[in-house]
């Protein structure tokens, strides 16, 4: 097991001889690096005295230049993206069009007279942050806690890890940005309950619902818009200034708009030469954008089951705008937590977490975490992760599974450990079978599976089927016979293969869905031929052939598109009772139900 430490407060000493780890907020617009000592956080400034370092990178005179607002911007948006995704997403393509190597089979950028992958370029920003901190602290830094958006998938997280490793960091942990912000508030203010984290950054908007209890932070829902941020507010103000005062749509006008926005966070009016704008006008201009964020936040609450919220935590410099606080209070009628600088809340949490992970102390409260994910094998060899890597323990998680084929009288359970997407690439812990189930149609049987880890790291897995009142349980020690080196290798392999694993999983899921659809429809045709004409059967068979060809081609996008085409054309082309039957099958019903 790995240990998280929560230390008792002492006098901070940022330069004392001890093990050091930093927290890094690698942002879309700006990045920060900080260190904590005895729960007091210091954000490290750059050589030109900036705490907020623009996440930009340029290459001139055979050197990388970081933070001068020139060159490649918003590289964070590219983490985990494929070349195909970039080409098919105009907003992303516009970021890299001047650098993109369209002849490559994978995403590479022509940068620094080389063809570089995204992690290799991002690593230079990590190196810059590392060098600035080492210069300030007069010591070598090798350990870091790095924050990532809650919605980042395995591929994106893997590329962040790789970039940091190239820069010379041992990544102690990746933590979600909303969790980091909540962590800062939770430690400093002993907060607990359910909180909405409203993160309006320069280029993205993220909202998360977190449950905070006794030092444990759980993200229970996320939502957002990765094309909405403080920069959009700047654009709206710029357009107003251009139209109102006949100014050119230029960088200078954009900078003027930013200055006006910042001034109006604490003054009622802004005047500069022949340009003026007051707080009321600003609020009228940006209200539609703010309302969009509120709607997204309300959707996130609905996804979480509409829990009672104890407060809203503000993250991101744009949240300094008074209108945002006012509208949030109107919408939710709860406390708005903003007394930590919203630009620094995330890096504060990362720095505090970094200190807890590396600073041994006699007066520490230890919280164990699961060092590797635990899950089980599903049909097709796919892994369903049930207890995730670095989840605090003890913990218990319940999930429901069902049978895949008709008349199945037993369910085999294969318990696995690891971060990979396919069972063959994970560590097998145990197998058992739930026998004596009543023979029923696929999908009728419901088996409730419980994964529990106690304070000693012992995993208990139990399965219970209600109809037959059948149950089975096993105990296993997941970490028996596995040392830290092997754990590190498994984690490294998971990150290294994240893209391949993710694509493999998508393909397997698409194949399973396609095969199930083909089986159901062909059985329906065989049993209900009297309800359809030959022409209708011909249309159905032709569409099924398209799906079969896609499966044979092993292309998950093609498979999904052919399934969508099937569903769409069935509705349009076949207007009989057979259409109703097929639609019911597509919703998961079986023929006996329909008859």
Curated annotation (Swiss-Prot):
The keyword Nucleotide-binding applies. One of its GO terms (biological process) is iron-sulfur cluster assembly. Keywords: ATP-binding, Chaperone, Nucleotide-binding, Stress response. It comes from the Bacteria. InterPro entries: ATPase_NBD, Heat_shock_70_CS, HSP70_C_sf, HSP70_peptide-bd_sf, Hsp_70_fam, ISC_FeS_clus_asmbl_HscA. GO terms for molecular function: ATP binding; ATP hydrolysis activity; ATP-dependent protein folding chaperone; unfolded protein binding. Signal peptide: none annotated. Belongs to the heat shock protein 70 family. Chaperone involved in the maturation of iron-sulfur cluster-containing proteins. Has a low intrinsic ATPase activity which is markedly stimulated by HscB. This is Chaperone protein HscA homolog. The lineage of its organism: Bacteria, Pseudomonadati, Pseudomonadota, Alphaproteobacteria, Rickettsiales.
